Curated annotation (Swiss-Prot):
Pfam families: DASH_Spc19 (PF08287). GO terms for biological process: attachment of spindle microtubules to kinetochore; cell division; mitotic sister chromatid biorientation; positive regulation of attachment of spindle microtubules to kinetochore; positive regulation of microtubule polymerization; protein transport along microtubule to mitotic spindle pole body. Residues 68-148 form a coiled coil. It is found in: Nucleus; Cytoplasm, Cytoskeleton, Spindle; Chromosome, Centromere, Kinetochore. Its main location: nucleus. Component of the DASH complex that connects microtubules with kinetochores and couples microtubule depolymerisation to chromosome movement; it is involved in retrieving kinetochores to the spindle poles before their re-orientation on the spindle in early mitosis and allows microtubule depolymerization to pull chromosomes apart and resist detachment during anaphase. GO terms for cellular component: cytoplasm; DASH complex; spindle microtubule. It comes from the Eukaryota. Belongs to the DASH complex SPC19 family. Keywords: Cell cycle, Cell division, Centromere, Chromosome, Chromosome partition, Coiled coil, Cytoplasm, Cytoskeleton, Kinetochore, Microtubule, Mitosis, Nucleus. This is DASH complex subunit SPC19. PANTHER family: DASH COMPLEX SUBUNIT SPC19.
Length: 148
């Protein structure tokens, strides 16, 4: 343990000597280049007053950069919302249809069952009326065939 401590001390002393030599060399090199030490290595903060016109121009430039991006994001958001609304309407109709099927299954197959309509267009309602009329006509024909 004493040996490793001695070796550590020797290594530390050599590092300190090497660092001292490096500092001396830097000082010598720095003397040749006063510009480097006086200007480049010194940090200065410069505060300047900016005119109101320049400030407004900078704001307008930022707005001109950001506005197209915001508009694009808004249009994407609107498209996504429309898509989700259509999907919600489809799911609502599917839910109503499945609810109707479940109610019909639970009620059994007795007589006429009431038709529950969700959101329908006039075209769909017209087709439904035509289908009911065809059904009634076919039932009459079946009754006539059985009667004869």
């Amino acid at each position: 343990m004493d040996i490793s401590l001695d070796e550590s001390c020797v290594a530390l002393e050599s590092s300190v000597k090497l660092l001292g030599k490096t500092l001396e060399r830097l000082a010598e090199q720095g003397e040749h280049s006063r510009r480097l030490t006086s200007t480049l290595l010194r940090s200065k903060r410069v505060f300047e007053l900016v005119s109101e016109y320049d400030l407004q121009r900078a704001r307008l430039d930022v707005i001109e950069e950001v506005e197209p991006v915001v508009e694009k994001l808004c249009s994407k958001l609107e498209k996504s919302l429309n898509k989700l609304e259509r999907e919600r309407a489809t799911l609502q109709q599917t839910y109503e249809l499945n609810q109707l099927r479940l109610n019909n299954r639970l009620a059994g197959s007795g007589g006429r069952r009431p038709v529950v309509m969700g959101t329908s267009t006039t075209e769909e309602l017209g087709r439904l009326r035509e289908a009911k009329q065809r059904k009634a006509a076919l039932e009459r024909e079946i009754a006539e065939v059985r009667g004869t």
